[in-house]
Curated annotation (Swiss-Prot):
Zinc finger feature spans (RING-type): 134-173
Ranges annotated as biased composition (Pro residues): 23-35
Acidic residues composition-biased segments: 78-100
Covalent cross-link Glycyl lysine isopeptide (Lys-Gly) (interchain with G-Cter in SUMO2) as placed by the record, residue numbers: 223, 234
Name by which UniProt lists this protein: Polycomb group RING finger protein 6
PROSITE patterns: ZF_RING_1 (PS00518), ZF_RING_2 (PS50089)
Membrane-spanning ranges: none
Source species, domain of life: Eukaryota
GO cellular component: nucleoplasm; nucleus; PcG protein complex; PRC1 complex
Organism: Homo sapiens
Comp. bias regions, Low complexity: 1-22, 36-48
InterPro entries associated with the record: PcG_RING_finger, PCGF6_RAWUL, RAWUL, Ubiquitin-like_domsf, Znf_RING, Znf_RING/FYVE/PHD, Znf_RING_CS
Cited SUPFAM superfamilies: RING/U-box, Ubiquitin-like
Taxonomic lineage from the root: Eukaryota, Metazoa, Chordata, Craniata, Vertebrata
Length: 350
């Protein structure tokens, strides 16, 4: 047939001879290693999976097994670290809440914020100013002094000066004492300490002003009082306790106010209940007139004339000057006698 190659036996043998001469001999094949059979009760090695070859989707080769174990332990440690961090955060939050509740307060440090605690409220000094001002001088309290009858507080110098011509509280108008209002006032050192802490440099400025005041006048600067040790009660005489304030020598003028009558048209008025009054010698006739107008409820158109002996007194004259000028003729049992009368004001007549 055409197109079919005819191979003879001789050609086949020649080809084999040529191929055997051209190809190298194959390497020797080592016999397979024999695995000893497991003894009774022992398990043999696990058979390898057919799909365990490298590059397959089966199990990893033996050399990658330590990495898989290390990754498992690393993941377990990371989970434990996260749990510890969460527990620490919860403990910190609880501690912060406890600190917030324990430190809940109002700081009065001149408006300065020491921490960022939201529950602490800062108060401006202007909100506290009405409580640390003296209503007489309109300044900050210096030597804060409180009236025991009404608990209103003023500067010591202001309230002592006020009591020279009045026995009433300048704030509520209550009678502090009929004759000696200085008996019913006390120093308030706690309030004064608060004022010094609230107002920066107030204490230093006050000390400097006091030092300059005494130095300009050539006087010795008074030293702060130092508490003395209490001596033993045995063998010591009893001492009379002195008042916190000494009664000024000016408060030694006792008055006897005598009513001599009123003209027609003076209007209605109340009689004076108490005609014995003790005031400062520096008080003027104008102060006495104001006292009479307030006590008697006089009409503004009513004029008050005050007479001592045969002298019609002027409003600017002080009681000490009147006593010195008139002498013993103005005195009766140690009292300065003043006569007063009510007349119609000349402005009303015209």
């Amino acid at each position: 047939m055409e197109g079919v190659a005819v191979v003879t036996a001789g050609s086949v043998g020649a080809a084999k001879t040529e191929g055997a001469a051209a190809l190298p001999p194959p390497p020797p094949v080592s016999p397979p290693a024999l695995t000893p059979a497991p003894a009774a009760g022992e398990e043999g090695p696990a058979p390898l999976s057919e799909t365990g070859a490298p590059g397959c989707s089966g199990s990893r080769p033996p050399e990658l097994e330590p990495e898989r174990s290390l990754g498992r332990f690393r993941g377990r440690f990371e989970d434990e670290d996260e749990e510890l961090e969460e527990e620490e955060e919860l403990e910190e939050e609880e501690e912060e809440e406890e600190e917030d509740m324990s430190h809940f307060s109002l700081r009065l440090e001149g408006g300065r914020q020491d921490s960022e605690d939201e529950e602490e409220r800062l108060i401006n000094l202007s909100e506290l100013t009405p409580y640390i001002l003296c209503s007489i001088c309109k300044g900050y309290l210096i030597d804060a002094t409180t009236i025991t009858e009404c608990l209103h507080t003023f500067c010591k110098s202001c309230i002592v000066r006020h009591f020279y011509y009045s026995n009433r509280c300048p704030k509520c108008n209550i009678v502090v004492h009929q004759t000696q209002p200085l008996y019913n006032i006390r120093l308030d050192r706690q309030l004064q300490d608060i004022v010094y802490k609230l107002v920066i440099n107030l204490e230093e400025r006050e000390k400097k002003q006091m030092h300059d005041f005494y130095k300009e006048r050539g006087l010795e600067v008074p030293k702060p009082a130092v508490p003395q040790p209490v001596p033993s009660s045995k063998g010591r005489s009893k001492k009379v306790l002195e008042s916190v304030f000494r009664i000024p020598p000016e408060l030694d003028m006792s008055l006897l106010l005598e009513f001599i009558g009123a003209n027609e048209g003076t209007g209605h008025f109340k009689p004076l209940e108490k005609k014995f009054v003790r005031v400062s010698g520096e008080a003027t006739i104008g102060h006495v007139e104001k006292f009479l107008r307030r006590k008697m409820g006089l009409d503004p158109a009513c004029q008050v004339d005050i007479i001592c002996g045969d002298h019609l007194l002027e409003q600017y004259q002080t009681l000490r000057e009147i006593r010195r000028a008139i002498g013993d003729a103005a005195m009766q049992d140690g009292l300065l006698v003043l006569h007063y009368g009510l007349v119609v004001s000349p402005l009303k007549i015209t």
